[in-house]
Amino acid sequence: MDPIRKPAWLQKKITPAAHAEMEGLLKELRLNTVCQQARCPNITECFGKRQATFLILGRICTRLCSFCSVSKETPLPLEPGEAASVAEAVKRLGLSHVVITSPTRDDLSDGGASVYAETVARIRSVSPRTKVELLIPDFRGERAALAAVVESAPDILGHNLETVPRLYSIRSGADYQRSLDLLAQARRMAPDLNTKSGLMLGLGEEEAELYAVMEDLLKAGCGYLSLGQYLAPSRMHHPVQRYVEPELFEKYKEKALAMGFEHVESAPYVRSSYHAENYLEVKSPPPEGEG
């Protein structure tokens, strides 16, 4: 089947020249970003603003999700000093909000949880005012791994459901209920923790299925939600079933807020970490003299 042609609202220009400074720093510190590995369409905008989502635990994933462009090979050993390098990048870039994520590392005994925790600690030691957001894998449902991450006290803990239960065959090795349980368990461990999840649209989901997932997330205590258009990285990946109109993204945002989510980012180019700093603004106290 031939791929569906992209509509006009999804024509976004990527300017490699705008990446030079950021890519130079990443190369110097031997760091990876999901922006590069996942071929994010927002890379020019974010790199131009000196923003990036750091990819720890290497560039190779142990799962075979059919929608993702991250490499699937034999994972390499962990990079010594990676957490310190991420912290150094955060400090040098002067980031007020940083997002840390990783490929799934089922080959590691704790799934990489200890590296997440160390990275948070390192960032806090050199840039204590920086808000730290983690976007974690499911750690195979291991409670001890999740506890190690929660105890590091990130400002936001994210875990993406990605799609509706009926389409979970595209998530190799994942389980819808396990992912929901992870979010719920994190809130039980730390009741004040801000939790977040994201969904890709255009994979073949129905509107009623989308709303059912929103209900499940709210029941799991998840207050933040991102909704964005799925874009197939290549013809070898899961094909796009539909390009969702911007008006529908706005409708879904209004519905999600009415259902009880605290903050929602919903638009064709929204990704998990896109405008990540906006989520915590709803929690910020008003300036003195206001409110």
From Swiss-Prot:
Residues of the Radical SAM core domain: 47-262
Binding site for [4Fe-4S] cluster 2: 61, 65, 68
Pfam families cross-referenced by the UniProt entry: Radical_SAM (PF04055)
An MF annotation (GO) of this entry: lipoate synthase activity
EC nos: 2.8.1.8
Catalysed reaction equations from the record: [[Fe-S] cluster scaffold protein carrying a second [4Fe-4S](2+) cluster] + N(6)-octanoyl-L-lysyl-[protein] + 2 oxidized [2Fe-2S]-[ferredoxin] + 2 S-adenosyl-L-methionine + 4 H(+) = [[Fe-S] cluster scaffold protein] + N(6)-[(R)-dihydrolipoyl]-L-lysyl-[protein] + 4 Fe(3+) + 2 hydrogen sulfide + 2 5'-deoxyadenosine + 2 L-methionine + 2 reduced [2Fe-2S]-[ferredoxin]
Required cofactor names: [4Fe-4S] cluster
The record's free-text note on cofactor binding: Binds 2 [4Fe-4S] clusters per subunit. One cluster is coordinated with 3 cysteines and an exchangeable S-adenosyl-L-methionine.
Positions that bind [4Fe-4S] cluster 1: 35, 40, 46, 273
Gene3D superfamilies: Aldolase class I
Keywords attached to this entry: 4Fe-4S, Cytoplasm, Iron, Iron-sulfur, Metal-binding, S-adenosyl-L-methionine, Transferase
GO cellular component: cytoplasm
Main EC class the enzyme belongs to: transferase
SUPFAM superfamilies: Radical SAM enzymes
Family affiliation: Belongs to the radical SAM superfamily. Lipoyl synthase family.
Protein name: Lipoyl synthase
Organism of provenance: Geobacter sp. (strain M21)
